[in-house]
Amino acid sequence: MPDRLVPATLARRDDGILVSPEYGELPRDASHARAHANRMLAGTGLPAHWRGRRTFTIVETGFGTGSRFLATWAAWRDDPARCERLHFVAIEPHPFARDDLRRAVSNFVADTTISENADALLDAWPMHVPGLHRLEFDAGRVVLTLAFGDAHDMLQRLVARADAFYLGNLASAAHGDVLSADVIRALARIAADGATYATHSHDDAVKHALEQTGFTSRDVEDGAGEPALRVGEYAPRWRMRRHEPPRALPVASREAIVIGAGLAGCAVVERLAARGWNITLIERHEQIASEASGNPAGVFHPLMTRDDNVASRLTRSGFLHALARWRALEEAGHAFARSTRGMIHLAESADDFARMRDAFDALGAPSDYVSLLDTDAARAHLNLPVAHGGLLFPHGGAVWPAGVCAAQIAAAGERVKLLAGTEVARLERDRDMWRAVDAASATLAEAPVVVLANAGDAVRLAGLRHVALQPVRGQLTLLPPGSTAPLPCPTIGDGYAVPLDDGTLLIGATFEPDDVDRTMRTAGHIENLERVRHLLPGLIGELPDVDTLRGRVAFRWVVADRVPVIGPLADEAQGVANARALSGAKARDLPRAAGLYGAFGYGSRGLVWAALGAELIASQLEGEPLPLERELVDAVDPARFLIRALRGRQIG
């Protein structure tokens, strides 16, 4: 069962003071609140500690009203010697609703900078669903990652290298003991050597736990009558960690080759360019988005299951991350076509609707994420006599994939060089560089990093023996304007129907594993029509000869476990050579092919997974906090197939 989020509450007492059961009294004086937050900065050695750094990461154990984040952001803005990119990761078991946060933040706003930052935070405040939420500010130079969920659980799942810690003192029945020994051990797991901390807690058990896990401890008075601040740094006398926190990949130059200019590859280009990388994008077709990414539209929605399994959590993270990235593209002037009236997932039977209801009840998600529609509500929404209810995703819908790709390439600007109509025959490794070579053995590009985002051909280029991809033929059908009843929003179930802007209705799609025939088939159109007529009775009227219908054939490449392949590729040869020693290994123990990454196997969920996959790879390259929890990173890890082979004694 998923952990349901319980939001913090806020009320105003008769004396005018804002109070919260989770946070107690909120300060009524903005200058006092700012001074309190600034003490935490000074206690961790900021801003001096981040100067001259490319990236700097702060982890906070309780976000609350965001006062410490806002003060840190303001200090970063005011410092001309600031780090290039500031990451702020905050654990929050009980996030405020947006309106309550607005009231709480109003107590803290004291100057123009804080006010502007607070407005930006409120505007970007995420939906109340569990997991990691990544928000970007100041053109991506300030990154806030909110971890909504239990403090201990989220810290255990966090993949990061922390340079400083703000340790909240939120010992309440609502929060539990957020500075328990288990929590502090989890903090030590992600601490960089020399990482600093500051806390207002003077609990002896907290001090003991800090010292037992490698942190020093001392009290600092400020001379202003405030309680002493406890500060220290991570300086263990012995190594206690099996795995060190992630570091940036050491490269001679920040250059990369991305192979494949569909949704996966273009998203990687945009994320790397945003971090200052220069990219050579190689596409075998004459145009970008020429394979499945070239479909007129694709549906976009998360999955929901009662147990909130890996697929549910991955698609939720991908869905929310894509929404944020697309909004950023649009705000930067790179708009593309996408629907704005939500999307309905209709149940296929009474039992299917019961499963949807169970999943909806288990997650307890807010209405801006999903609503449950009974049969009558679904009929009223669609104005069609549907047989069952379903789920309404108000931010789901249909998206023009090629438009997304074009927007991402435009955002990358001069940092990307496109080689279209160019086939990569093989990859060669020369010292610390990768070389992409064509069939005539001519070098197309050289770089220390290669990202394979070319679907089915990625396995061949990487020489992977333990990753199997399967092609699935999908034929969609285009029904001419005037041949169907109006459909207010994209609708899916057993099949899907998407109204396009010109009045055409896109329906589909067939699912034909291991079929690589690109020829349009009448049988495929008939299958699509039958499924949508069953899903949405009364939608499709009389049609001309089926043989005259337009459509498109594309291929989705899927992995056996239906989870994408994202991240650093395993060095299979070295893994096989050390099979006995690695038989009980975790993914983090496996050798990797230096600088070689994969972003493929997205199947029919490229719109959901591409932006998140790109952010994951860029974060891995830069040694930044990852946008996914540890078990989800492991779920998409390209090395998972080699791990299974090693554990099953299939090799060695």
Swiss-Prot record:
Necessary cofactors: FAD
Native source organism of the sequence: Burkholderia ambifaria (strain MC40-6)
Gene name of this polypeptide: mnmC
Entry function: Catalyzes the last two steps in the biosynthesis of 5-methylaminomethyl-2-thiouridine (mnm(5)s(2)U) at the wobble position (U34) in tRNA. Catalyzes the FAD-dependent demodification of cmnm(5)s(2)U34 to nm(5)s(2)U34, followed by the transfer of a methyl group from S-adenosyl-L-methionine to nm(5)s(2)U34, to form mnm(5)s(2)U34.
Family classification: In the N-terminal section; belongs to the methyltransferase superfamily. tRNA (mnm(5)s(2)U34)-methyltransferase family.
Key words, A-Z: Cytoplasm, FAD, Flavoprotein, Methyltransferase, Multifunctional enzyme, Oxidoreductase, S-adenosyl-L-methionine, Transferase, tRNA processing
Cellular compartments annotated: Cytoplasm
One annotated GO molecular function: flavin adenine dinucleotide binding
Record region (tRNA (mnm(5)s(2)U34)-methyltransferase): 1-235
Designated name of the protein: tRNA 5-methylaminomethyl-2-thiouridine biosynthesis bifunctional protein MnmC
